[in-house]
Structure formats: structure tokens, C-alpha cells
Amino acid sequence: MSRLTVYRDDAPDTILLDVTTPGEIAETLRPHNIRFDRWSAPITPAPDAPAEEVLDAYRPYLDTLMGETGAGSADVVRINASTPNLPELRKKFLSEHTHSEDEVRFFVHGQGAFVLHIRGRVYSVLCTQGDLISVPAGIPHWFDAGPSPDVVALRVFTDTTGWIAQYTGDDIANRFPAEVPVEASGNS
């Protein structure tokens, strides 16, 4: 189940808001220009389906989204136990960073938390299968798919060079709880 949990950035043990309905999540994030939406497809590709099959299943949504955002490319990313250098990759994702373009992800399978650091607040958005999130360029954030990830996601890019992070150097991610339950990190 999708979830948004909001904290003060200096009080990781104090929850200010905790909502689980997609409409409430979207409404809370909208003032920060963060898009949260749900997509459904006529078929749900298997987690190990070829990338082209996954892209084709969501093509109508992707075409609309890419037209709205001016994005130039989309691909499929898989993060699981067989991902090369998984510990190093996870460490990179767990460090607060920004991007020079919007970070757009659609969760085909599994779940992960985008944790956003905005104006003295931390917004932890647990995304699950069927969720779309678009984090605007320049918003400090980190991502956690859990210690045993099993995620398949569509990535949409304007810059065809792909995922490029600018790290903030802030260790804030170390002070906040993981939002992906260990027992559920591979489930949707």
C-alpha cells in the first residue's frame, strides 16, 4: 500500500502526517510540484518480462507523459538481489542528492521510498506497484528500496545520459527511519 509520512527535518521520531490514500498523497505533494498518480495497464507484465514488453504495456501512459514533460527517453530498471554492486548502488541511492532534471519513476513491480527534504520537512513517499512519482529537478531526496529489493520501474528522462546525481553532503538520510519494511521489500 502506498503511504506518505511527513516529519520535521529535525525530529525523525515525530510524525506530522501519515496518509495512505492516493488522492491524499497527491494533494499533499502537489504544492511542492511533485506529481503522484496511479496507473493501471490492461496487463501487468511479469517481474522478469523483457524490457520491451514492459514498455509496450505502458506505452499509452508513457507517450502522454513524455509529451507533457518533453522527455526524450524511457527505460526499465530492475533492482534485486542479482543487481551487480547492489550494496554500493544502495549506498548511492541512500545519500541525499538532487538532479538537474525531474526524476520520474513508475513502479511496475515491488516498492521503494522516495524521501524528499523540502523546507524543513521530510516527506517519505512509499511507492508501490502502479504508482507514478515525479520529483522536480533540484529537490533534495534519497531513495530506499530496502535491504532486499525486488523492484521493476520505468524511468523517464529528458537528458538521454540517464541518472546523474549531485550529492548534497548532508547526512540527513542516516537520521530517518527506513520506510520499506524488511519483510515487504520484495513485495508489492
Curated annotation (Swiss-Prot):
Output the Pfam families linked to this UniProt entry: ARD (PF03079)
The record's annotation in PANTHER family points to: ACIREDUCTONE DIOXYGENASE
Pathway where it operates: Amino-acid biosynthesis; L-methionine biosynthesis via salvage pathway; L-methionine from S-methyl-5-thio-alpha-D-ribose 1-phosphate: step 5/6
Site note May play a role in metal incorporation in vivo applies to: 96
Biological process annotations from GO: L-methionine salvage from methylthioadenosine; L-methionine salvage from S-adenosylmethionine
Q: What does this protein do?
A: Catalyzes 2 different reactions between oxygen and the acireductone 1,2-dihydroxy-3-keto-5-methylthiopentene (DHK-MTPene) depending upon the metal bound in the active site. Fe-containing acireductone dioxygenase (Fe-ARD) produces formate and 2-keto-4-methylthiobutyrate (KMTB), the alpha-ketoacid precursor of methionine in the methionine recycle pathway. Ni-containing acireductone dioxygenase (Ni-ARD) produces methylthiopropionate, carbon monoxide and formate, and does not lie on the methionine recycle pathway.
Q: How does it assemble?
A: Monomer.
- Name assigned to this protein: Acireductone dioxygenase
Keyword Oxidoreductase assigned: yes
Query: Mind telling me which residues the site (May play a role in transmitting local conformational changes) is annotated on?
Result: 102
Q: What protein family is recorded? A: Belongs to the acireductone dioxygenase (ARD) family.
Q: Which UniProt keywords apply?
A: Amino-acid biosynthesis, Dioxygenase, Iron, Metal-binding, Methionine biosynthesis, Nickel, Oxidoreductase
Co-factor(s): Fe(2+); Ni(2+)
